[in-house]
């Protein structure tokens, strides 16, 4: 009877063999396809890593350029801070009574040349007239305000302030009406 069943269904045997072959082909194609997918994923991963590294390098270069520009822009800051007391001393010397005209003229020339050199580097005096601004002025004393002098205005300047571009080197020391 077993032979009879095989003879009756030779088509079933062929169909089963074809199904086995198709399954084997699918299994053999699956690893190839997954290897291809893995290779594509790795390629995408490497591309992403490359793009990130490239962007990071551009950011590093941009930051280095900005830092170099900042250093260039504020290179004279330390020198200016060292020279400002000399300018203050020249102003005090010019305020002394009894100087001969020649000495006074010589001191004024030195003062003007120093101020000119500072201006060429972007260093300028902070205006100390009008309203008090805590960003540029340091109140060291207050005096009562009156009708002629409203509150929060500058009464007197004890020491001039200076700035380098937008950076304060030294705030102006002032007396403020309160």
Curated annotation (Swiss-Prot):
Main localization category: cytoplasm
Region span, Disordered: 1-42
One GO cellular component term noted in the UniProt record for this chain: cytoplasm
Any Pfam family matching the protein: GrpE
Keyword terms: Chaperone, Cytoplasm, Stress response
Biological processes annotated in GO: protein folding
Family: Belongs to the GrpE family.
Name used for this protein in its record: Protein GrpE
